[in-house]
């Protein structure tokens, strides 16, 4: 995936990427496996502001020698049916519209998507914010997760794990995928006090107090330090 020609401002996104090298390395290893035809699905959880999107942008912004397909769910009162896959379908070469009259849309589309992904070129497939997903999207994710092991695909599915409910559809899907060999659940933790200190001290901010106020949440840390800079 080619990088954007626009350049971020000073330290943009970087504040959220401290202590993320291990997970970036894990994703790189997963893509290497996928390139050899052994696909996997990474179920990436973390609270709001943990830096999931920043991490995925950093990973996909590298020269991966892979096709990148990116879709996202949106916070709507009526979620878009197969929302993230509407984003993915055209660049993936799948004509989603032809499945619309069929009630088995998720099953039909999942089959078409798997067929398209079963080629010799590796693919990184990102589906963001599935805590807002409709049931059809979750069905496609589940069906893909069951078949991904034989595909040259690294699928990364992100969600807010602090918004899971005991009887929610997403928790059920995550539980079912946990029983497959190719799906792995990973958690993106808050920053440690040491990481917050690395960011706070150059700005003359008390690190312990900032850590206590933000809980190490990268977004809150970033916003607090930006407010100091604005003053």
Regions from the PLM with identified roles:
Residues 1-231:
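Key residue(s) within conserved catalytic/signature motifs
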């Amino acid at each position: 995936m080619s990088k954007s020609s626009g350049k971020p401002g000073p330290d943009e996104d970087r504040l959220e990427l401290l202590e993320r090298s291990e997970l970036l390395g894990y994703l790189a290893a997963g893509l290497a496996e996928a390139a050899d035809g052994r696909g996997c699905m990474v179920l990436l959880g973390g609270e709001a502001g943990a830096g999931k999107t920043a991490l995925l942008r950093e990973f996909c912004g590298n020269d991966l020698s892979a096709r990148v397909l990116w879709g996202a769910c949106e916070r709507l009162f009526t979620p878009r049916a197969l929302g993230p896959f509407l984003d993915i379908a055209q660049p993936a070469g799948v004509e989603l519209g032809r499945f619309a009259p069929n009630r088995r849309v998720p099953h039909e589309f999942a089959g078409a998507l798997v067929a398209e992904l079963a080629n010799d070129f590796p693919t990184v497939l990102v589906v963001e914010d599935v805590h807002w997903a409709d049931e059809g999207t979750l069905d496609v994710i589940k069906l893909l997760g069951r078949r991904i092991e034989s595909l040259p695909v690294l699928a990364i599915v992100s969600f807010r794990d602090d918004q899971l409910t005991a009887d929610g559809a997403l928790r059920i899907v995550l539980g079912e995928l946990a029983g497959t060999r190719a799906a792995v659940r990973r958690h993106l933790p808050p920053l440690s006090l040491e990481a917050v200190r690395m960011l706070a001290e150059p700005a003359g901010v008390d690190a312990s107090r900032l850590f206590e106020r933000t809980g190490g949440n990268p977004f809150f840390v970033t916003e607090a330090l930006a407010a100091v800079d604005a003053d």
